[in-house]
């Protein structure tokens, strides 16, 4: 459960209440939107609801990047960023930052019974250049005999890995952690960059427990049909047939075989919702691709049959209709027209693409 990001902090932390009340303010279309977040009581209710249905919720508190919302609430812990990604990082040079983040993780660990705790670690490069001139980070480099800000990032992640493990949790993080040489024991790597299959191979070769969740085809905020206009389309779209064909369709491209996957714990699809502003939009992007994900996760390649899957989907569509789920109907794309999404552009880089 991705509870924090640059755009918002969505969980109550008792010791640092401004994380939610200030870090939870605003959205893409209105920076003055009142704070929206989950109270710890609401979190407990959701966990109980999930447990009754045999679902385990794993929390993610992203660090040291994607910290803009948190830094709006407590700027004294900011490590800076860039014009495009302001106040993007936590300050890894301040000892107070480690106390602050440890206290946050203690509350998270006490709240969530899952043995896993995700602390992100992705895309720190978006803000790391600010560390080159930050006096606290520079003092850390000198004190610890480090040469580069990348080594400061490694220092930070090693310390926070120890914190997570001290709380009795297994660390989960994105595939950038492979560059930081975190220990293999009690660590799970989430491989998300489909255009960097070498990171998958490195994770498996080094013996890390690995979850495969590459953007293509498992990011469900990506467009799923050629005529859809809203959604990410960076280098193609993610149709249901590709989700069903995952992962065996890409073995040759990745340079792996089924026998290499002994360390893979499973697969995961990610639905990033910072630009999904209605329930219908979320449903439309998740269903029916979620059904293909489920079958891919529990089916060996030798027993997969896409035509039979499509036949079974007829019962799923009947259920979706009964539950009033606004799904994408690949049988008749006009059955549920594509819900409009916001169009967000930054300079020349398209963040949320719209196709005329």
Annotate the PLM regions.
Residues 45, 54, 98-116, 123, ...:
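Substrate-binding groove of N-acetylhexosamine-processing glycoside hydrolases
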Residues 1-169:
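Substrate-binding cleft of carbohydrate-active enzyme catalytic domains
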């Amino acid at each position: 459960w991705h509870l924090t990001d640059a755009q918002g902090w969505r969980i109550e932390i008792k010791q640092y209440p401004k994380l939610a009340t200030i870090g939870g303010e605003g959205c893409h279309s209105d920076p003055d939107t009142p704070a929206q977040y989950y109270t710890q009581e609401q979190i407990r209710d959701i966990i109980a609801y999930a447990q009754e249905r045999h679902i385990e919720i794993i929390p993610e508190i992203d660090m040291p990047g994607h910290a803009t919302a948190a830094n709006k609430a407590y700027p004294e812990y900011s490590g800076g960023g860039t014009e495009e990604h302001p106040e993007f990082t936590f300050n890894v040079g301040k000892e107070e930052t480690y106390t602050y983040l440890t206290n946050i993780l203690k509350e998270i660990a006490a709240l969530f019974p899952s043995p896993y705790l995700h602390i992100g670690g992705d895309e720190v490069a978006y803000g790391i250049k600010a560390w080159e001139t930050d006096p606290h980070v520079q003092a850390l480099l000198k004190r610890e005999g480090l040469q580069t800000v990348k080594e400061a990032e490694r220092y930070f992640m090693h310390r926070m890995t120890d914190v997570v493990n001290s709380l009795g949790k297994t660390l989960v993080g994105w595939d950038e952690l492979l560059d930081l040489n975190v220990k293999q024991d009690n660590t799970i790597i989430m491989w998300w960059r489909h255009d960097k299959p070498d990171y998958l191979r490195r994770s498996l070769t080094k013996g890390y427990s690995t979850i495969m969740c590459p953007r293509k085809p498992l990011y469900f905020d990506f467009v799923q049909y050629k005529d859809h206009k809203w959604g990410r389309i960076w280098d193609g779209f993610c149709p249901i047939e590709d989700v069903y064909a995952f992962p065996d369709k890409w073995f040759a491209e990745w340079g792996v075989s089924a026998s290499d996957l002994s360390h893979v714990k499973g697969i995961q699809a990610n639905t990033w919702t910072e630009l999904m502003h209605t329930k219908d939009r979320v449903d439309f992007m998740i269903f029916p691709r979620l059904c293909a994900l489920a079958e891919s996760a529990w089916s060996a390649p030798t027993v997969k049959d896409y035509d039979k899957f499509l036949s079974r989907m007829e019962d799923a569509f009947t259920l979706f209709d009964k539950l009033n789920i606004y799904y994408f109907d690949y049988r008749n794309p006009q059955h549920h027209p594509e819900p409009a999404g916001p169009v967000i552009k930054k300079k020349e880089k398209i963040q949320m693409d719209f196709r005329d």
